[in-house]
Amino acid sequence: MANYILSLDQGTTSSRAILFTREGDIKQIAQKEFTQIYPQPGWVEHNANEIFDTQSYVMRECLQFAGVDASDVAAIGITNQRETTVVWDKKTGAPIHNAIVWQDRRTAGFCDELKAKGLADVIRQKTGLVIDAYFSGTKVRWILDNVPGAREKADKGELLFGTIDSWLIWNLTKGAVHVTDESNASRTLLFNINTGAWDDELLAIIGVPAAMLPRVSKSSEVVGEIHPEFLGKALPIAGNAGDQQAATYGNACLKEGMAKNTYGTGCFMLMNTGKAPRPSNNNLLTTMAWATPSGRYFALEGSVFIAGAVVQWLRDGLGIIQSAPEVEQLALSVPDNGGVFLVPAFAGLGAPHWDQYARGAMVGITRGATKAHIARAALESIALQTLDIMDCMQKDAGIKLDTLRADGGATRNNLLMQFQADVLGVPVERPMVTETTALGAAYLAGLAVGFWKSEEEIAAMWQLDRRFEPNMAQSDRDKLLHDWQRAVARSKAWIEA
């Protein structure tokens, strides 16, 4: 009997493979960063071949470092940066353009055209999404319109589109399987979350031929096998979900009303709303959570584009710190932000503002401001953006959160977690296993092959590492929020369309 599940966690800045035990513990992690490509301001690309090469490399390295043979792996689960778009040649398997990343803003003008045509309501009703350059559909259209001959080839069925999960599965199966799951499909602007299928009207609006699209599977389902050349054995690919949905599952937010926030490159709060889509009146997204044999589940989501990436900027852009972990000690060297607020709208503002033309702003700077105040303001911006979303989520769901589960790399920062609890006014729980994105993909894969028997078994494995209790006076919280909202207002509509 196999003893492990292997998760492939394809993120925005690195590809990782994580081996999980039957108890849901981490046996081994392998990670490799890849190149970020910025052709011009507001554009972000990845080399799709480099993504696959790094992912297949860490997949092998993970098992090698663990001393585990592929025959001891029951299944593979995949989770991925969502919305990032690849278009490739069906015959050769070669991408016709770099992958356009979820952060990329080049299609903002086309999104404005769709809004001007009065299409926002029909798109929201069918997809649960807002019209924004964030989502995959407009990125596909851009590639077809800007790569010579691409649209003609797409119309003939010679090109394929996929989010990163589709691209990985296509390559791992040597072109035998072209598939995505409902959670990833629901992030394209092309998928009707009510019918659970690609939508002809949406395809016509965006301008994407149906022949390019992958089959849509459940999130927990055997969709194919990886080719034996990769690990020496054909293993079932049995779980697949976008990173934030996978993190919600991995954090065992399996009951209606439970919520988690993932602190990664961006920040993403999801609340499980059960088996019915919950429309948002506060500029949040209604999205698929996952589809399993027990049914189709939905979530409310608030997406923050820049969270952990602001710490990368402190390191790589400003040189304030040499490594990401240093930011906590630097920020702790001052008692507060000194009146400095940083709005990291480097790629516009996501929920609940949805301002494609906002840009980063730092306000409240005096001669007494230091790099420590800037570091503290950067960390606080992550928590304050999360507060904006939680307020909207509680209104939409009609549920007052009593606890927020947190995951992702930045949760290791105790200052950030405590400040988050302080400004939210509710406890923040950090799980023992913070790699919940990969864990969620593992759970979905394990369920599909009987490695785990039920969601009740999975929920019982969740373990608390630390609970951060709120410890801030309401008056202080109100003042912070007031000044934060003033700072956000100054970042909006900075680019003149």
From Swiss-Prot:
Record InterPro entries: ATPase_NBD, Carb_kinase_FGGY, Carb_kinase_FGGY_CS, FGGY_C, FGGY_N, Glycerol_kin
Natural source organism: Solidesulfovibrio magneticus (strain ATCC 700980 / DSM 13731 / RS-1) (Desulfovibrio magneticus)
Residues involved in glycerol binding: R82, E83, Y134, D243, Q244
Stated name of the protein: Glycerol kinase
Keywords from the named record: ATP-binding, Glycerol metabolism, Kinase, Nucleotide-binding, Transferase
Gene3D superfamilies: 3.30.420.40
Gene that produces this protein: glpK
Coiled-coil intervals: none
Function according to Swiss-Prot or TrEMBL: Key enzyme in the regulation of glycerol uptake and metabolism. Catalyzes the phosphorylation of glycerol to yield sn-glycerol 3-phosphate.
GO CC entries: cytosol
GO biological process: glycerol catabolic process; glycerol metabolic process; glycerol-3-phosphate metabolic process
Positions bound to ATP: T12, T13, S14, T265, G308, Q312, G409
Family: Belongs to the FGGY kinase family.
GO terms of molecular function: ATP binding; glycerol kinase activity
Keyword Thylakoid: no
Binding, ADP: T12, R16, T265, G308, G409, N413
EC number: 2.7.1.30
Binding positions for sn-glycerol 3-phosphate per the UniProt entry: T12, R82, E83, Y134, D243
Protein activity control: Inhibited by fructose 1,6-bisphosphate (FBP).
UniProt key word Kinase: yes
